[in-house]
UniProtKB/Swiss-Prot annotation:
Belongs to the dCTP deaminase family. The keyword Hydrolase applies. Pathway: Pyrimidine metabolism; dUMP biosynthesis; dUMP from dCTP (dUTP route): step 1/2. SUPFAM superfamilies: dUTPase-like (SSF51283). This is dCTP deaminase. The active site is at residue 138. The gene is dcd. The lineage of its organism: Bacteria, Pseudomonadati, Pseudomonadota, Gammaproteobacteria, Alteromonadales. Keywords: Hydrolase, Nucleotide metabolism, Nucleotide-binding. It is an enzyme of class 3 (hydrolase). InterPro entries: dCTP_deaminase, dUTPase-like_sf, dUTPase_trimeric. Its EC number is 3.5.4.13.
Length: 197
């Protein structure tokens, strides 16, 4: 069952769902709570590697990722991040989100931004039960013009769904969880995957 605005507000008041900073009441509507853009980004460096072999040896995968990912870029107050056409970048939400083990979150981009060519999440829009941390956004500009993105602008919306029972393996209890407590624009940790499974 997806939570309505009234239930989202109540879950926030009761501390079942934690969002920091706490959203204003007017950020909650229908079945979502608005989230804003944070100030940390990463970009892919052009021509630093001919390719990334995602199924190669872990050390080679990590080495390739280290070559293609920029250091984290932290914007000063009032500055904009420019995402150019055809460019992929990582960013974080301004808000940190903590979910209990019986609620899954769903991140959706804004229609107004999509109509300008901005994809807020390339594929990863599920926020697992037991998650705690900032959410990394995978931005892609499929439009024709560069887009200026500013910290604290409204970037997307989260909805929440109650599971039929608490998850047996919530994110915060998993040994293989790669992004626990992330607070920055964390690059892919695919090299940590167990390739034998």
């Amino acid at each position: 069952m997806r939570l309505c605005d009234r239930d989202i507000y109540q879950h926030l008041q009761d501390g079942k769902i934690k969002i920091d900073p706490t959203p204003d009441y007017d950020q909650i509507s229908g079945v979502t709570v608005d989230i804003r853009l944070g100030n940390k980004f990463r970009v892919f460096e052009d021509h630093q590697a001919p390719f990334i072999d995602l199924s190669g040896p872990k050390a080679q995968v990590q080495e390739a990722l280290d070559h293609v990912m920029s250091d984290e870029i932290e914007l000063e107050e009032g500055k904009a991040f420019f995402l150019h056409p055809g460019e992929l970048a990582l960013a974080i939400t301004h808000e940190s989100v903590t979910l209990p083990d019986n609620i899954v979150g769903w991140l959706d981009g804004r229609s107004s931004l999509a109509r300008l060519g901005l994809m807020v999440h390339v594929t990863a829009h599920r926020i697992d039960p037991g998650w705690s941390g900032n959410i990394v956004l995978e931005f892609y500009n499929s439009g024709k013009l560069p887009l200026a993105l500013r910290p604290k602008m409204k970037i997307g919306a989260l909805s929440f769904e109650v599971l039929s029972a608490p998850a047996e393996k919530p994110y915060n209890a998993r040994v293989d969880a790669k992004y626990k407590g992330q607070a920055g624009a964390v690059a892919s940790r695919i090299s940590s995957d167990d390739q034998s499974k």
